[in-house]
Amino acid sequence: MKKILFLYFLSICCLGFSQTFVVADSLTKEPLAFATVVLDEKEMLYSNEKGVFTIQNQFEKITLTYLGYNDFVSERKLLKDTIFLNPKPFELQEVTITNNNVPLQKIGFLKRAKLLYSLPISPKTELVICIVPVEKHVNSYVETIEFPLRKIKFYNDTDKLYKNVPAVVRVNIYTVKNKLPDQKIFSSEPIKFIMSNKELIKVDISREMIQLPQEGLCFGIEMIGRVNQDGEFVEENSYAQPIFTDNESPDYTAQTYHNAFLGKDNLYDMNVSFNREISRIVKNHTYKNYNLAIGLTLRK
């Protein structure tokens, strides 16, 4: 009997494990929406619009990251209900005054591909395009980044069409090492969009003073998730659908990857899957280089 009771209470503890936390600014005490949470380098989630997140599984180590704040790393046993992130100190950079009449250089979107011209990405994943500029754009400052999104039509179990459903993405920038994304140097504020609309995700980074070096930069669009009326994330039927092109640009060469963030071999060359799928549809298909459609504004 004692053994049965022990197993009963043990099962309740295991099945009922759940911890709720709030992530907030250590100075203002304001909650931080859509912070990235990683558990034991195996599981990833986000805080909601109120900075709240709930952990359903056992874990030993937690890491929280947020734009403009120092990373927070802790063991589970040391955690409190509210996790405070410390803002990074603002560093004044040396600024060179240039001629304001220098025109901006606009790199527009390339024409979308005829077949498989978009790809839905689910929460906790990212599409990343690595760009190597031609000589005239080397060391230009990146002013704006744009990603066009295709509208998504999807249905629930009763075949009711979802409309005007909000979701959240984020734009990331990485350095390049061995032609692959390396260190993250910028992450935008979370950006809301409507999944059932054609959207243009645009980020102004003119204050960041990020230059486009000879080896290039990688630009990613990360899907955080669909948001319900309570500000909570819903992973079911939750997608962003960036546009792809199969045209070559006179301003850069590029390669696009799918990034799953966690685990080994998390980067996947999108050309492999795109060309494989098209070869099943089109006889005598000629290999093409498929990349994210991206728009950039540069300044010398």
Language model features with spans:
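A short, amphipathic beta-strand motif
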Residues: 19-27, 51, 83, 95
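Short, acidic, small-residue-rich periplasmic hinge/interaction motif at the N-terminus
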Residues: 65-67, 84-118
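Short, well-structured beta-strand segments enriched in hydrophobic/aromatic residues
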Residues: 205-246
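A short, solvent-exposed loop/turn motif at the edges and junctions
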Residues: 63-76
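Short, ordered, surface-exposed loop/turn motifs in non-cytosolic proteins
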Residues: 27-41
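Surface-exposed turn/loop modules enriched in turn-prone residues
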Residues: 140-202
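PGST-rich, cysteine-poor low-complexity/disordered linker and tail segments that act as flexible spacers
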Residues: 245-300
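Short, acidic Ser/Thr/Gly-rich low-complexity loop/linker segments typical of extracellular
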Residues: 42-52
